[in-house]
Amino acid sequence: MALRNIMNFKKDDILKKKSRAVENIDGRILTLLEDMTETMYNANGAGLAAVQVGILKRIIVIDDGRVLIKLINPVIVEEFGEQQELEGCLSIPGVYGRVKRPEKVVVEALNERGQLITLEGTGLLARAFCHEIDHLNGILFIDKVLPGTLVNINQSEPEIR
C-alpha cells in the first residue's frame, strides 16, 4: 500500500472530468483500492474517489464509521426522501457547504471480486455515496451547494470558485 497525492480543485482540472468504467479487476485495480483506502484514512476522510488521486476510473472507497466499503463502477439506482447537510471534501480543504441530497439511496456496484452487489445507504452513508459518485461524473459538492451556505475557513483564500 502507498499514500497517493490528493488532487486539489484549484490546481487539478482532472476533478472536472468524467471517470471511465473499470473493464477488468486486476492487480492494479486492487492495489489502487488499497492505496485509496490508506490515503483516505491518512487524510481523516470518510470517502475518496479514484479521480481524487488522479485516476479516471469509476472506483470509490467510503468509511461511514461502521464499515469500509470499496465499490467499482457504482451507480445509484434508487433515491428516496431529502436531506440538507453540511459537506466538505478532501480535494477542497477548509471549505464546507450545505448540499441537498437524498435521505436514502440504493447503489449497485461490483465488489473487489467482481461480484455485482446492491447496498442501501441512509443519512450520512447516502450522502457519502452521492458525493463520491458525483466525483466520478466530474461534479464537486461546491457545484451543488445551497446558496448562502458556503463557508471557507481558510482566511487567506477567500475565492472558492
List the predicted regions and their residue ranges.
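Positively charged
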Residues: M1-R161
